[in-house]
Amino acid sequence: MDNGDWGYMMSDPVTLNVGGHLYTTSLTTLTRYPDSMLGAMFGGDFPTARDPQGNYFIDRDGPLFRYVLNFLRTSELTLPLDFKEFDLLRKEADFYQIEPLIQCLNDPRPLYPMDTFEEVVELSSTRKLSKYSNPVAVIITQLTITTKVHSLLEGISNYFTKWNKHMMDTRDCQVSFTFGPCDYHQEVSLRVHLMEYITKQGFTIRNTRVHHMSERANENTVEHNWTFCRLARKTDD
């Protein structure tokens, strides 16, 4: 095979099935780092497997391979601001043995710009339940959203006006909805809508907590807490 034929093959599209996710690239990209596993695999030094459609098959994390492939294309590591799967991506880099990518992921310098910070939203649901009534009967419930993101609080106050009949209280850094006595499904409906609204503003759930308390002989109090976070850029005052 002459150099012209080899050059054509190196630029020819190649489709990979990585954990069920399909990616199309070129042999030139895949062999960018000859000492890597992909370099050996597509350089003919490593056995390859194919799926029933004839695509090269690699049994690894499909969604994370996009970051590996983009690094092969540009030699730069570019991640979303809210990226949280660093440990998993390090394992993928180790598997593919792409040394420059491994170095980037182990670099102590921050992967995100220094002018970013994390915004936090706390959503809590406190329900007082009667021990002697139907399990879904609620004596009183309070849903509280706590955050320093005032635009989010204003949006909730303006968007959820139909819930005013359940005594909405707006204070500095908080919006609270108090129900009672009410059916459990009313609180669940509002909580689901609040979570959808918060996530549409770019927040993702960081953690959840549940706490059970007994205040009186005939009451149980259950408190649920959800923490949402998003990265934002600092602005000069």
From Swiss-Prot:
Function comment: Probable substrate-specific adapter of a BCR (BTB-CUL3-RBX1) E3 ubiquitin-protein ligase complex mediating the ubiquitination and subsequent proteasomal degradation of target proteins. Promotes the ubiquitination of HDAC1; the function seems to depend on KCTD11:KCTD6 oligomerization. Can function as antagonist of the Hedgehog pathway by affecting the nuclear transfer of transcription factor GLI1; the function probably occurs via HDAC1 down-regulation, keeping GLI1 acetylated and inactive. Inhibits cell growth and tumorigenicity of medulloblastoma (MDB).
Residues annotated as domain BTB: 12-81
Name listed for the protein in its UniProt record: BTB/POZ domain-containing protein KCTD6
Gene Ontology MF, one: identical protein binding
GO terms under cellular component: M band
UniProt-listed InterPro entries: BTB/POZ_dom, SKP1/BTB/POZ_sf, T1-type_BTB
Domain of life: Eukaryota
Keywords from the named record: Cytoplasm, Growth regulation, Tumor suppressor, Ubl conjugation pathway
Organism: Mus musculus
Sequence segments annotated as region (Interaction with USP21): 113-187
Phylogenetic classification of the source organism: Eukaryota, Metazoa, Chordata, Craniata, Vertebrata
